[in-house]
C-alpha cells in the first residue's frame, strides 16, 4: 500500500500540532520505548551508562528523530539519511522486534499528544508512514550488514 495524499495530510497536520512541544513529546516517546522494552536503553550509545536517570531532554540525539519531519516538511527521507540510519541500526544490533516496539511507542505517544485529532484514519496514516520508513531502514540494514 502506498502513502496517500490524505494520509500525508493527516501526518503533517498532527505534526504541526505537536511540533510546538516536540522536545517534550520526544522525551515521552523515548520513555515509552524504555517502558515497553527497558533493555532498549542499551542500544542508544548516549544512554548506555546513564543509570536510571535519563536526561533525554538535554541531549540533541534524543530529539533528532522526532524533529526530522519538522525540518524537512515532508515524509520522504533522503538516500544518504537512509544509508546512515541503516548502518547505525546494524551497529546497534537492531532487530525486527525492535521496530515493533518503536512503532507501538510512536503511536502511543502521538495518540497522547493529539487526542482531539486521533482517529482510526490518523492511526493508519502514522502506521503507513512508519512502516514505509522502517522497511527502507531494514533494506539499508541488509546492505550495511
Curated annotation (Swiss-Prot):
Family matches, as SUPFAM superfamilies: Globin-like
GO MF annotations, alphabetized: heme binding; metal ion binding; oxidoreductase activity; oxygen binding; oxygen carrier activity
Gene Ontology cellular component terms for the protein in this record: cytoplasm; nucleus
Catalytic activity of the protein: Fe(III)-heme b-[protein] + nitric oxide + H2O = Fe(II)-heme b-[protein] + nitrite + 2 H(+)
Annotated site, Homodimerization, chain positions: 123
Cofactor note: Binds 1 heme group per subunit.
InterPro entries in alphabetical order: Globin, Globin-like_sf, Globin/Proto, Leghaemoglobin-like
Cofactor field: heme b
Tissue: Expressed in embryonic (embryos, coleoptiles and seminal roots) and vegetative (leaves and roots) organs.
Motif (Homodimerization): 35-39, 96-108
Domain (Globin) ranges: 2-142
Family annotation (Gene3D superfamilies): Globins (1.10.490.10)
Binding site for heme b: 45, 59, 61, 84, 88-89
Membrane spanning stretches: none
Keywords of the record: Cytoplasm, Heme, Iron, Metal-binding, Nucleus, Oxidoreductase, Oxygen transport, Transport
E.C. designation(s): 1.7.2.-
Subcellular location: Cytoplasm; Nucleus
Complexes and interactors: Homodimer.
Family listed: Belongs to the plant globin family.
Function of the molecule: Phytoglobin that reduces nitrite to nitric oxide under anoxic conditions (e.g. during flooding or in waterlogged soil). May not function as an oxygen storage or transport protein. Has an unusually high affinity for O(2) through an hexacoordinate heme iron because of a very low dissociation constant.
Protein name (database record): Anaerobic nitrite reductase NSHB5
The organism of origin for this protein: Oryza sativa subsp. indica
Lineage: Eukaryota, Viridiplantae, Streptophyta, Embryophyta, Tracheophyta
Amino acid at each position: 500500500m502506498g502513502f496517500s495524499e490524505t494520509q500525508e495530510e493527516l501526518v503533517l497536520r498532527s505534526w504541526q500540532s505537536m511540533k510546538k512541544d516536540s522536545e517534550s513529546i520526544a522525551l515521552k516517546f523515548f520513555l515509552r520505548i524504555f517502558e515497553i522494552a527497558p533493555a532498549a536503553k542499551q542500544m542508544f550509545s548516549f544512554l548506555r551508562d546513564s543509570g536510571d536517570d535519563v536526561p533525554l531532554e538535554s541531549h540533541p540525539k534524543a530529539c533528532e528523530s522526532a524533529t526530522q519531519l519538522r525540518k524537512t516538511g515532508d515524509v520522504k527521507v533522503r538516500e544518504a539519511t537512509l544509508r546512515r540510519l541503516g548502518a547505525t541500526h546494524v551497529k546497534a544490533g537492531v532487530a525486527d522486534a525492535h521496530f515493533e516496539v518503536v512503532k507501538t511507542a510512536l503511536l502511543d505517544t502521538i495518540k497522547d499528544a493529539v487526542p482531539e485529532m486521533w482517529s482510526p484514519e490518523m492511526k493508519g496514516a502514522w502506521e503507513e508512514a512508519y512502516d514505509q520508513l522502517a522497511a527502507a531502514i531494514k533494506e539499508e540494514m541488509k546492505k550495511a550488514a
